[in-house]
Every structure is written in C-alpha cells, then in structure tokens.
Amino acid sequence: MSGQRVDVKVVMLGKEYVGKTSLVERYVHDRFLVGPYQNTIGAAFVAKVMCVGDRTVTLGIWDTAGSERYEAMSRIYYRGAKAAIVCYDLTDSSSFERAKFWVKELRSLEEGCQIYLCGTKSDLLEEDRRRRRVDFHDVQDYADNIKAQLFETSSKTGQSVDELFQKVAEDYVSVAAFQVMTEDKGVDLSQKANPYFYSCCHH
C-alpha cells in the first residue's frame, strides 16, 4: 500500500454560528475573515491534499448548514462519511447539546464514521475565561464515552486547527492499513459542488 492515494470524506456538523465555515477557511486557506459570514445553504465542498507518511491523502470536506431547517439535507451530505467533525461554541452551552444530537444521528446512520468533537472560539476564552459555558472535563467525559477525540480550537488564531485535520487524516490512514482495500471507498470528488483542491504536499 506504499504510496497509495487515499480519499477521505469528512463532514462538518454543528449548530449555526458555531464557526464551522471559519474552521474550514483557516485550515484550507490559512485565513480568518472578519465580519459576518453568509449562512451556508445545504453544504459547501472543498478538498485539500496532504501527506501522511508516504501516502497522499485527499480530505474532501463538506461544510454543512447548521440551521435546523436543513437537517434532512445534511443527512445527504454525511452519508458515507469516514470522519465527522462535530462543532460546538465554547461560549454557548446550547451548541454542545446540539452537538450531542448530531452524534446520535451519526451513530444511528453511519456507525463506521469516526467522530471528532471540536470546541470553537477558544480565543474568546483567552480574552475572558468567564465566557466559557461548556466545561472541558464534561466534554472530555462525553468524548471518552462515545470514543471520540476532543479538540478546542480557534479559527482566529489557528490554535489546534491543523492538528485536528492532521489527526483525522492520520487516523483514517491507520485504519486503512489494517484493511484490504480493493477499490477507493472515499469521497467521490466528481460530485456536484464546484470542488476546489488545495495541496500541502511538497516533493
């Protein structure tokens, strides 16, 4: 399997305004856009190529709408996902409760999907610790219970963003190394949505 290309479908889930799009912008474009984002309708797609060992990994990232009215549509996008980054706002306790909803959805519909819990806007806590509304230890206990990994991130400063996506890729490659793969089972990069590709592999 040396030098094999690996495609991984990754879905971003979470309540609206938790910062899913900002997270993707920071990872793919290494930028933080100031000002209000236009709400995602349905889902936005972007792909980024990276290297894990001697493998070329393409993360196909689906940034789904957080509004409850798009719930049914979101299910279309996370079908077949190998990894899900479930986001919540560290300053909004209701967003963590909403994250639990998405975890239940994934567990019932995509049992093989690896879940990563992602607390966002950690920079706001650096400014004022009293703004925290989601206790780290409570989330860690929950993550342990559902066998998920936990990251607290800031799209503004870039804290732990690259580490999160790197871990997603490394975990999938590790799992793939123990499986007999006769064909690509990752994201179909020909799907509609005007895919854009960004590479961080350098030869």
From Swiss-Prot:
Organs and tissues of expression: Widely expressed, with highest expression in brain.
Q: What is the effect of changing residue 22 to N?
A: Predominantly in the GTP-bound state. No effect on subcellular location
Gene, per the UniProt record: Rab24
Q: What is this protein called?
A: Ras-related protein Rab-24
> Positions of the region Switch I?
30-45
Q: What is said about its interaction partners and assembly?
A: Interacts with ZFYVE20. Does not interact with the GDP dissociation inhibitors ARHGDIA and ARHGDIB.
Additional information: The unusual Ser-67, instead of a conserved Gln in other family members, is the cause of low GTPase activity. As a result, the predominant nucleotide associated with the protein is GTP.
Q: Lipidation annotated as S-geranylgeranyl cysteine: which positions?
A: 200-201
Annotated residues that bind GTP are located at 19-21, 40, 66, 121, 123, 156
EC code(s) of this entry: 3.6.5.2
Bilayer topology annotation: Lipid-anchor
